[in-house]
């Protein structure tokens, strides 16, 4: 079973200048580490031996990122990547560290992550961490926010049944979902089908339909979706 590192933010009573220096020079020391076993139904998938297409990651490579605790930067230029299949944020102490030695960041609503231009937050479910998940923040509006949930479907490898057929490799496929976040914090899933799309924008269905037609927007295009939600936010 793969071992993961659970990260807990350490509290240091030091000046701001000292804190900044520590962040740049000794980032990993801001995090106390201990091991625990992560139990998921995908825990035994070995990507090194598996014949597959697609990827469980939104980006297979580790990219330079930042970790924030209560909106305060605690780790900068740290190698990060998001495993959407098991909903884990992975990190390494350095880019020279083998990927096999990567660790999982503690899931906490107090910890946010930035990977490149993408900002991820952890949202608990009914007050609990276990069933909560990571979301990418696409828009922060005055009244409404737009979050993206990355979902990966895993289809196991299928061995050839006869000599006339071939093995079908396992595959990871993307199935993202988008959520409108209301002022009270409630998540409303935005339908992907055109006939139901406007139902997410309660009270402004006609205005949203007109805005889409006038601007020739594609609801399946993420940039257009951001425009739509931003417009909805502006007319409420």
Regions found by a protein language model. Give the residues of each.
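Exposed alpha-helical structural elements
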Residues: 23-26, 110, 196, 207
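Long, compositionally biased interface segments
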Residues: 189-192, 198-236
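Aromatic-patch recognition
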Residues: 58-59, 63-189
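Short hydrophobic/aromatic-rich motifs at helix boundaries and adjacent loops
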Residues: 26, 35-38, 179-182, 197-200
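N-terminal ordered "arm"
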Residues: 46, 50-64
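Bacterial Sec-dependent N-terminal signal peptides
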Residues: 1-25, 228
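Sec-dependent signal peptide cleavage junction
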Residues: 17-51
């Amino acid at each position: 079973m793969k071992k993961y590192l659970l990260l807990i933010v350490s509290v240091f009573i030091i000046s701001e200048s000292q804190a900044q220096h520590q962040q740049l020079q000794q980032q990993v020391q801001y995090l106390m580490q201990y091991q625990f076993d992560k139990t998921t139904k995908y825990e035994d998938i070995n990507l090194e031996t598996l014949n597959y297409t697609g990827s469980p990651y939104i980006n297979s490579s580790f990219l330079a990122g930042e970790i924030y605790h209560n909106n305060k930067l605690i780790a900068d230029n740290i190698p990060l990547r998001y495993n959407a299949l098991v909903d884990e944020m992975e990190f390494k102490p350095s880019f020279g560290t083998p990927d096999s030695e990567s660790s999982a960041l503690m899931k906490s609503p107090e910890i946010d992550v930035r990977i490149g231009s993408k900002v991820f937050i952890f949202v608990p479910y009914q007050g609990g961490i276990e069933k909560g998940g990571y979301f990418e923040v696409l828009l922060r509006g005055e009244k409404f926010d737009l979050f993206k949930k990355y979902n990966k479907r895993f289809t196991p490898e299928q061995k050839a049944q006869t000599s006339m057929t071939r093995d079908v490799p396992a595959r990871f496929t993307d199935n993202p979902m988008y959520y409108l976040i209301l002022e009270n914090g409630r998540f409303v899933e935005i339908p992907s089908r055109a006939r139901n799309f406007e139902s997410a924008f309660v009270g402004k269905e006609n205005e949203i339909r007109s805005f889409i037609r006038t601007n020739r927007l594609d609801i399946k295009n993420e940039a257009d979706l951001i425009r739509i939600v931003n417009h909805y936010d502006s007319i409420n």
